[in-house]
């Protein structure tokens, strides 16, 4: 397992900041906290580290400016609040960073910007250019146009996608939670704090609670989801409290936080994109034999597919689901949904007879696939990743 190291030894850091840290329900923007945060960012940049910020707070800030009532907002109310709040949020970041002569660059992303390959590459190029000229990208979901059906849903997973997109080696999630516990500490006095997480296992996933406040959409569940995306690409992750001023300095000085170790063998950029897809177009449900084959680094053949769900086209990302109902892999499917259903459970030699054309022998080729769950020991998986990535 890669050991934890000081922040100053990382090359590129993505910092996600929760709404509750930036915005007070009554007072609005927490200017003093933001100024202190920007001072921390300036300190990292002085060490030659690239810094990207995924900043929540647009809806919360707009809600404060518009004096909207407490409770859940309708979609159009959230979008209006985002439209008002995003301007104020961008201005606040720009003003605070400019105190240290740092330029801020605003980037608003929608789900398609990371899920569609061409737009993904374009967004990555824009972010990399901002970093090249020394600016700090301030990134948020474009809540003014995103709907409940086509959105990230929280900035934890957005931050993880940004980290993988830009090749960051550390993702820091700042919120009102100081890390991962074995159970919600406010409900269980015997809950144990976990300082180091070597691997996100099913047991770790089960520990994730549902803590979320009115000002934010995220909780520990989404942070663990973010960790799975980030660590699979070789990026370490830290969950830490941002309640104190200068939270990055606090982490550096030993404040309590949970550190998630990166995968020992980062996958290729293309496989990173596949693994991080937030909304697979469909699902392939497979049998135990297929699970064993995939764990050995082999392709998914039609014979191992028990059923097909969803509407997808050839080349779309699909989730591969094991007999227990848990996702074990993701990949680019070789057939559209209708043809996949027709050949599911059949031998590859029968494909041409069934479909009328000689398709690929594999439903999902191993070169187009990334494992998203544990099969076998970690050392065995790392050897396979090194062979097939």
Swiss-Prot record:
Pfam families: AA_kinase, PUA. ATP binds at residues 16, 175-176. Its EC number is 2.7.2.11. This is Glutamate 5-kinase. Belongs to the glutamate 5-kinase family. Catalyzes the transfer of a phosphate group to glutamate to form L-glutamate 5-phosphate. PANTHER family: GLUTAMATE 5-KINASE, ISOPENTENYL PHOSPHATE KINASE. One of its GO terms (biological process) is L-proline biosynthetic process. One of its GO terms (cellular component) is cytosol. It catalyses: L-glutamate + ATP = L-glutamyl 5-phosphate + ADP. It comes from the Bacteria. It is found in: Cytoplasm. GO terms for molecular function: ATP binding; glutamate 5-kinase activity; RNA binding. Substrate binds at residues 56, 143, 155. Residues 281-358 form the PUA domain. Pathway: Amino-acid biosynthesis; L-proline biosynthesis; L-glutamate 5-semialdehyde from L-glutamate: step 1/2. Keywords: Amino-acid biosynthesis, ATP-binding, Cytoplasm, Kinase, Nucleotide-binding, Proline biosynthesis, Transferase.
